[in-house]
């Protein structure tokens, strides 16, 4: 983006090998710049896995003004997903990252038209639960979204109910004005020495034995 921030995928080369990767240029209208989408195709347990790493346009400048930007991003991803599925209808695909929308917001919901399932959605409405806190309100901006190929009991599958927010006391501020907020590393120019202003999430994937 304009700050030089890019998406990345960290992986253990002992269990995952990259076959190909590329940034998908996310060109918004006008002079707006935002982060590229990182696409990685790799082998996990000798099965092909397609991963899209996302950081959708933020709500900076107002939510209503930013909604069209995220719609363009969603449509761009859907285009690339369709190209993958044209070649392999059983492709196993994961979308993950910071979508700057909740699972039930309009642009994330566009992905469901392709048969994708948001593993974060069942957590909506739980008290004091979320991955991001803004003005005292919890949001579920960080999500993992999978297609039916990862729920079909064939090859790679997400283990049921393995979706988990890494929400331990050390990851949140425990006192002061920002009590309960994720314990971030930086606050403006001030070094807090924490972890992130978002909480991490995780799932477990196993391979169905043939």
Across the structure, where does each feature detected by a protein language model lie?
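Second-shell loop/turn segments in exported
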Residues: 27-28, 60-68, 95-97, 130-132, ...
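His/acidic metal-ligating clusters that form di-metal
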Residues: 73-96
